[in-house]
Amino acid sequence: AWNRRSRSCGGVLRDPPGKIFNSDGPQKDCVWTIKVKPHFHVVIAIPPLNLSCGKEYVELLDGPPGSEIIGKICGGISLVFRSSSNIATIKYLRTSGQRASPFHIYYYADPEGPLPFPYFERQTIIATEKNIP
């Protein structure tokens, strides 16, 4: 079970606010699905990452696994994203032999309604490196 802070490789997270840490274990692909109460949106805050672009990156999806990929992020920027529903997914992917770089990502629940400050919207494409597959 995930309890506000986790170094586990993936899972379903239902208790915002929280903080996700990447796993330094053998897993190459980690998927966290964040579900908040109906009539709320998921807000994801990603500080600047320092991942080895091309070998590891984070994907941000607007909805459950299999939803539209909003962007692939490996470094250079910080961002805040607000989902279009009460579900968002974060994936961490790395190639075999690539040691996991440390990172953390925050998530929150935000009620429906006007945005209190600028968020990256669904149509925003986030890419910090051109060599990400």
From Swiss-Prot:
Claim: rRNA processing is one of the keywords in the record: no
Predominant location category: secreted
Pfam family, one: CUB
Localisation per UniProt entry: Secreted
Modified residues (N-acetylalanine): 1
Disulphide bond pairs: 9-30, 53-74
InterPro entries per UniProt: CUB_dom, Sperma_CUB_dom_sf, Spermadhesin
Function: Mediates the binding of spermatozoa to component(s) of the egg's zona pellucida by a carbohydrate-binding mechanism. It is a secretory component of the male accessory glands being coated to the sperm surface at the time of ejaculation.
Annotated spans, Heparin-binding: 73-110
Gene Ontology CC terms: extracellular region
The entry's keywords: Acetylation, Disulfide bond, Fertilization, Secreted
Superkingdom of origin organism: Eukaryota
Family statement drawn from the similarity comment of this UniProt entry: Belongs to the spermadhesin family.
Name the record gives this protein: Carbohydrate-binding protein AWN
Gene Ontology biological process terms in this record: single fertilization
Ranges of residues in domain CUB: 9-110
